[in-house]
Amino acid sequence: GYIATTTANLYVQYLSNGQYDEESRYQTLNWTPNYGVITNINRIIELNENADTKVAASANGSNANQVATANILKAYYFSIMTDRWGMLPFSEANKGLENPFPAYDSQAAIYDGLFAMIDSALSSMDSGNGPSGDILFGGNMATWTKFANTLKMTMALKLSKADATKG
């Protein structure tokens, strides 16, 4: 799995690392797989908001709830990424050839965007079915709400160390 691969990567890099650690070019993880997941999440959102595909997508649960859970999951991935790397492409990310060189956003701007994304997702949920095939919470929207609020709380705790007025 993911942890086993990371551990093996660390071990190999420890043995192959040069004498001067500050000049090491080795890195255990990069953000490419995370942006790949976010691309898939954006596709879910697109399928549920596009007039041509919306009806077919509703067979997998309420369109609003699919978009809400996708945005919560996207916020989760971006929170992990910004905690690890700090500044990264957020507001202009995942535009493909439309914007091959997205600007980097500050961590403060990313966190502001993530709080807004989660709040929007929570307010857009409806009483319809949650997403079918949901391997995290089985389509249980109450659990998705708890997860979203927990994510907001964790982000606020992290942010409180940097900016007490926001956290």
Each language-model region and where it sits:
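Conserved, well-structured interaction surfaces
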Residues: T7-M87, L97-G133
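Solvent-exposed, flexible loop/coil residues
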Residues: S24, P89-N94, G139-M141
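Hydrophobic alpha-helical membrane-insertion signals
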Residues: G1-Y2
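N-terminal post-signal-peptidase region of extra-cytosolic proteins
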Residues: G133-G139
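Aromatic-residue-lined binding/catalytic grooves and analogous aromatic/hydrophobic interfacial grooves
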Residues: D112-G130, M141-G167
